[in-house]
Amino acid sequence: MAAPALGLVCGRCPELGLVLLLLLLSLLCGAAGSQEAGTGAGAGSLAGSCGCGTPQRPGAHGSSAAAHRYSREANAPGPVPGERQLAHSKMVPIPAGVFTMGTDDPQIKQDGEAPARRVTIDAFYMDAYEVSNTEFEKFVNSTGYLTEAEKFGDSFVFEGMLSEQVKTNIQQAVAAAPWWLPVKGANWRHPEGPDSTILHRPDHPVLHVSWNDAVAYCTWAGKRLPTEAEWEYSCRGGLHNRLFPWGNKLQPKGQHYANIWQGEFPVTNTGEDGFQGTAPVDAFPPNGYGLYNIVGNAWEWTSDWWTVHHSVEETLNPKGPPSGKDRVKKGGSYMCHRSYCYRYRCAARSQNTPDSSASNLGFRCAADRLPTMD
């Protein structure tokens, strides 16, 4: 039975609060759709929080004590040069440089893609790959960490990836994006619900991780989340004023460079790039800095709080506003298509609450120096 389209899902909210939140989301999504309708062919049909990206946990502020604790440890003085390096997932050096962040030709104006501004970035390191299921499992086995999706007991999953048995047990959906369903038992170990597993995809990106979960992992690994500026600088791979990490053409010489949606969304994904869901983290050619799947495949968290108002004067290692409600995510996912979610461009951006999770949301880490043993 198809799930009725409700404006919001929150099994943990009082009934009165839920009604109010439903009304608020309906108003917000309607406004977002009206704004985006006039942004041209490249614009998505829904705001990031309503359809293109990942549904948000409504007003939830899940326990982030572990993430904050790990963050404090990560900000402690680093090890001195010469100490033995940890065995860690591959990181690549990102050289210092100046680049144009954002764009003066925004495709989704309300996302705050504009204006173009010159930004200087110090040298740092970036994970060559999105954090995989295998890498995240090492973290969980070492620490006993429970993700917020596991604590809440559910997470959002794209309907097209669900079994019929799981769908029959779902009574609610997101009105603005009915292909997003809240699935009990969906988490990083069970990306499509309790009858799914990651055993056959250890090298795929870990999914259903909140911003707090990502911070906890990166800090445990001696790393951190990249800033939005670092992420976008890395995405461009040394190229200037280009849409994608490899240039301006989506498929140069007919070759696929990213895992995105082909076909009519959300009805048919033809999988012309070889995948209908996520791909292994080393799929597709790397960009000029050696980064794989920096766009498409899975959305990636950054450390910045969300804002659509950018200072053109903050030109050295910008870190975004000091506070906010949502965190910035970049890169788009396997669900993105130009007709609906043209957010697999380096300048594109979206947002989610720090405790939100879904079946297209992952991350990769950055570091000022390569992690070392204590």
From Swiss-Prot:
Residues at which Ca(2+) 1 binds: 259-260, 273, 275
Cofactor(s) it depends on: Cu(2+)
Record note on what altering residue 20 to F does: In MSD; loss of activity
SS bonds (residue pairs): 50-52, 218-365, 235-346
Post-translational modification: N-glycosylated. Contains high-mannose-type oligosaccharides.
Self-association state and partner proteins as the record states: Monomer, homodimer and heterodimer with SUMF2.
Protein name according to UniProt: Formylglycine-generating enzyme
